[in-house]
Amino acid sequence: LVDYQWDGQVKVITGIRRCGKSYLLRTLFKNYLLEHGVKKEQILSFELDLAKDIRFRNPLELSAYVREIVEPSAEQYYLFVDEIQMSDQVPNPYNVNGAPITFYDALNDLRSLPNLDVYVTGSNSKMLSKDILTQFRGRSDEVRVHPLSFSEFYSAVGGDKQGAFETYAFYGGMPLILSRPSDMAKMNCLKALFSEVFLKDI
């Protein structure tokens, strides 16, 4: 993400549910920005899966809100939109017979603001690479997030390397496994994730 800053594109962070996309954007990257002089007020963050931001599922609401803050200012701003697949399509208020307005339309528009850098996350079947390239009309960078590699997994757990590898080989590299202390908890966690992905994302 650091390398893609201010390249004029929408940065689209994709990957399977719970693989760490939101953590990468709203924790790791946000902390990096704050440590490098960006003020908290310069980071506009929305979580479309939470009730507090539900009105911003409407692309026109989000666009108007962001423009009201960014356009009059000389400051540089970062826009984070988490879980873009929760966004709505809305009727075109200027042409009732026209195509509905989508989040892609709003973000393509906001991307043109010279003092705004746009980042979004998404995790379902609508966020495939070919769809991203089509919907953003070539104005996006896809940043693909995968589950942890064994090297990343071992750097977190430490200890006996062979034992860590056996755990990794059996349970995989989903980051949330690291916080589950027992085998039963790990299994239940993976079952719940499977059900969530199957029901919500496929």
Regions found by a protein language model. Name each.
Residues 13:
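Hydrophobic anchor at the beta1->P-loop junction of P-loop NTPases
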